[in-house]
Amino acid sequence: MTRKRTGVPWMPAPEFARTLSGLTVNLLVRSVAASLPFYTDVLGLNLLYCDEDFAALEGPGRWHMMLHADHTLDHSPMEIARLADLGKRGTGAEIRILGIDPDEVEARARARGFTVNVPAATFPHGWRECRLEDANGYMFAVGVLPN
C-alpha cells in the first residue's frame, strides 16, 4: 500500500479496528482533503483523524465512516481498474443516514456547491429527507422521522 503520510498515525490500524462495531462505511476517494468538507461541514460528522491517506469520522450514535485515498489501494489491481472508470462512484448504492436534519444539510450543501439531487421533503416511507452527493459522486439520503 502506498502511503503519503509522513507522520505517525493517530493510532495503529488494529487498535482503531477494535473500536468499530456493527456497520462501518469505508469509501474510496480521489482526495481525502477534498472530500472532507462534505462529511464535516455538510453532514456534520465528527472528524476523528485525517491525513493524506485516510480519514476516520464519527456520526450520531457513534457509528463510523472511513475515507481511504485511491493511492492506498495500489496493492489491488482489480480495485485500481474499477477506480479508473470515469463514472460516478457508488452508482446503484445509496447511503442512508437517519438522525441528521435534512433541511439543515440541504442548506449547507447548497451553500458549499454540492449537488442536491432531491430537496428535503417528507416521503411516504416516513422519513423527512434530502438526497445529495459528495465530491466523488457517492449518493446519500439523510433524514429524520417527523413528529
Residue ranges and their predicted role:
Residues 26, 136-138:
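Asparagine-centered polar/low-complexity signal
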Residues 139-143:
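Short C-terminal beta-strand
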Residues 2-24, 46-98, 104-133, 144-147:
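Vicinal oxygen chelate
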Residues 35-40, 109, 137:
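Conserved active-site tyrosine of GNAT-family acetyltransferases
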Residues 31-32, 100-102:
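Helix N-cap motif at beta-to-alpha junctions
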Residues 26-30, 34-37, 49:
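Short, contiguous, helix-prone interaction/anchoring segments in small proteins
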